[in-house]
Amino acid sequence: KGNIIMCGIAGLIHKGKTVNIGKELQDMLQALKHRGPDSTGFALYGEGNSQGDYIMRFKVGENVAEGSSAVKEDKSIYDTRRKQVDKHIRDLGGDIVKDEQLTPYSFRYVIKYDKDLMEFSKAIESVEMTEILSMGKTLELVKDIGDAAVVSKQYGLDKIKGTHAIGHSRMATESGVDIRSAHPFWGYPFSDV
């Protein structure tokens, strides 16, 4: 017999001001590391961009770090999948304004798009192993394997400014240790939910 401790949740709201929510939430979730060290997720409502474009975070594979239950793949497949995503965006009338590769499998795009998000999301996620983590004008959802400090450093979250955020540190009890199973989740296919 022993104590079972699982998962930790933290959130913050700053009314009327923009602050470094990435760093604040990282510190809060790191204090909850004992509640769930397997994966950590951040839902950050940042400043958005001045043009009002969509910010899309997505992955084309899984993190196969120590402790992961994901199947190891040849990393060259990630580039192929990313090119397929780019083609779908163009074919749907979207324009990639800015693209960042954050890990071998994870990306952040700023996109001009003014059509149906459901159609867009289905097309992007039709690419094998591809999942949109978030899409919105201010919401950015980041999740990966590791504690809050590891994930924050990997994605540069300590630089994100905004008004509110919620996060989750996870102990995998009934599903695999992978990004797909990490929390929180995007309200597919709605912007900023």
Spell out what each predicted region is.
Residues 2-193:
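N-terminal segments that mediate ammonia production and transfer
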